[in-house]
Amino acid sequence: MNAPAMTSDRLVLREEVLGSRRFSNIWWGTVAAIGGIGFLLAGLSSYLRVNLLIVSDTSQLVFIPQGIALLFYGIAGSALSLYLWFTIILDIGGGYNEFNKETGKVTIFRWGFPGKNRRIEVSYPLADIQAIRADIKEGLNTKRKLYIQLKQRREIPLTRVGRPISLSELENQGAELARFLGVPLEGL
C-alpha cells in the first residue's frame, strides 16, 4: 500500500492516518457478506424445503442438525459482515496527526464509534514534546510504531493500527518528524 499522505509547509506538518477503509477490510467484508448470505439461504432452504440458492439444491438437507448449523453460520457471517461494513463506512480509526508551529500545538485526531466519543481529538503544546520514539520488535508478531514522547513520560502513538509499515518508511517518517519538531529520534 502507499505511504500515508504527509503534507508540509514550513509551519504545519499534517499526516493523514488510514483507518478502517483499507482494502483488506473491504475484501473480508465482501467475502463475509457473500458467505454469510449463502449459508443463511442454505439454512432457510433446508427449513422451508424450497431451493433459495442458484448454485446448489439444499432443500433436501435435514433441518436438524445440518440446516440449523448452516443457519447459525449464516447469521454469524452476516453479523461479521455488517460490523465490518459499519466500521468501513464510519472510517473508524481514520484521522490525522497535525504539528502546527503557528499555534504551537500538536493535534491527534481519530474517528471513533458513534456516541459521545465519536470525535477523538487530543492536543498538546509542541513544547511538551521531548522526543519521537520508534518502537521496533521483529519476530512472529512484528511491531513497528512511532510515538510522541511527552514531558509527563506519556507516549502517544502516531502510526495506524493494522499492517506494520516498512522499516525504511518508519525511519523516514520518524526522521522527518524529528527534524520538523527539532527533537531527537530515539529507538533506531
UniProtKB/Swiss-Prot annotation:
Task: Please tell me whether the keyword Transport is annotated for this protein.
Answer: no
> Any transmembrane segments, and where?
26-46, 70-90
Q: Which GO terms describe its cellular component?
A: photosystem I; plasma membrane-derived thylakoid membrane
Example GO BP: photosynthesis
Please report the record's description of how this protein sits within the membrane: Multi-pass membrane protein
Pfam families assigned to the protein according to its UniProt record, in alphabetical order: Ycf4
Q: Please state where this protein is localized.
A: Cellular thylakoid membrane
Q: Which InterPro entries match?
A: PSI_Ycf4_assembly
Q: Which domain of life is it from?
A: Bacteria
State where it is primarily located.
membrane
- Give the family, as the similarity comment puts it: Belongs to the Ycf4 family.
- Give the function comment from the record: Seems to be required for the assembly of the photosystem I complex.
How is this protein named in the record? Photosystem I assembly protein Ycf4
Organism field: Rippkaea orientalis (strain PCC 8801 / RF-1) (Cyanothece sp. (strain PCC 8801))
Its ancestry begins with: Bacteria, Bacillati, Cyanobacteriota, Cyanophyceae, Oscillatoriophycideae
